[in-house]
Every structure is written in C-alpha cells, then in structure tokens.
Regions:
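Polytopic alpha-helical membrane proteins, predominantly small-molecule transporters/carriers
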Residues: 1-108
C-alpha cells in the first residue's frame, strides 16, 4: 500500500471525525466540538488533496466519501442509537464492497 492510500485512509478518518463533530457542536454553539469540526474538516480536505497527487481522482473521491458514509453510519448506530435495521446494514455493506472493489482496481 502506497502513501496515497495511507493519506486517503487518514483523510477518511478525519472526515468521520468532522461529521460526528458537526452533530456535537450544535450549530457551532459549543466551543470544543466546533474547533474539532474546523480542524478535522480542513485536515480531511488537505489529506485528500495530498492523496490525489498519486491516486486516480475518481477512485480517491469515491473511497473518501464511502469511508465517511460508512464510518458515520456505523458510529451513529453505536453512539447516537440510530437505526440498525437490515436495510441500513445491507446498504453499508454494499458501500464497503464498492470501496474494496475500487482498491482492487488500483493494485500496483
């Protein structure tokens, strides 16, 4: 796995933190969650920008958004008691399958 994929993974993690902190900052009325939102959002975009220097743009963007969607959906189930019905879990599984498929197309 090259640096591009490592940076993309870090960007995806920062994206998950960004999205979760959006919920916690309550419209930017809470200081620390608001600071985390700004830092993680900026960091996520910066890391994505660095990753697309070596990865195909379409692949990198799809993986980044997919990671964010899956991470937030799964953590939403555990942290915010969001629905975990079988349709939602099946949909999350399809996103994961798509991410794996995109990674497999970039084998060096």
């Amino acid at each position: 796995m090259g640096w591009g994929w490592i940076l993309l993974f870090a960007a995806g993690c920062a994206e998950i933190i960004f999205a979760l902190s959006l919920k916690l900052n309550e419209g930017f009325t809470r200081l620390w969650p608001s600071i985390v939102t700004m830092i993680s959002g900026g960091g996520s975009f910066y890391l994505l920008m660095m990753a697309i220097k070596t990865l195909p743009l379409g692949t990198a963007y799809a993986v980044w958004t997919g990671m964010g969607a899956v991470g937030v959906a799964v953590l939403g189930i555990f942290l915010f008691k969001e629905s975990a019905d079988w349709w939602r879990l099946a949909s999350i599984s399809l996103i994961v399958l798509g991410i794996v498929g995109l990674k497999l197309t970039d084998i060096e």
